[in-house]
Amino acid sequence: MGKLTLLLLVLLGWLQYSLWLGKNGIHDYTRVDEDVASQQGNNAKLKARNDRLFAEIDDLNGGSEAIEERARNELGMIKPGETFYRLVPDQNRRNAQQGRPASQ
């Protein structure tokens, strides 16, 4: 009976060592679990970005308002008969807001 108990204790010790310190043990499991959580967060961000891009593509394919808005904002285009006004801040006022002396 003593040999069987000793054998079972050695087997239990080996299993505990493998569980805590061995390959594919608890430490490896927690590291992989953290990596999976990080990758899932990254995937969620990329999915949200893809959804925004698909929505923009659908908007551009669906109507002329989105195309017109982009032409106005990015290219500075105007419709025939419209007057375009560009408001440029006064240089002295801009320098005063930034704390620099006015250049003469």
Curated annotation (Swiss-Prot):
Protein name per the record: Cell division protein FtsB
InterPro entries: Cell_div_FtsB, FtsL/DivIC
Coiled coil: 33-62
TM segment ranges: 4-21
GO CC terms of this entry: cell division site; cell septum; plasma membrane
Biological process, per Gene Ontology: FtsZ-dependent cytokinesis
Keywords assigned by UniProt, alphabetized: Cell cycle, Cell division, Cell inner membrane, Cell membrane, Coiled coil, Membrane, Transmembrane, Transmembrane helix
Complexes and interactors: Part of a complex composed of FtsB, FtsL and FtsQ.
Family the entry assigns: Belongs to the FtsB family.
Gene name of this polypeptide: ftsB
Function: Essential cell division protein. May link together the upstream cell division proteins, which are predominantly cytoplasmic, with the downstream cell division proteins, which are predominantly periplasmic.
Periplasmic side: 22-104
Main location: membrane
Positions on the Cytoplasmic side per record topology: 1-3
Species of the source: Erwinia tasmaniensis (strain DSM 17950 / CFBP 7177 / CIP 109463 / NCPPB 4357 / Et1/99)
Membrane topology annotation: Single-pass type II membrane protein
Cell cycle found in the keyword field: yes
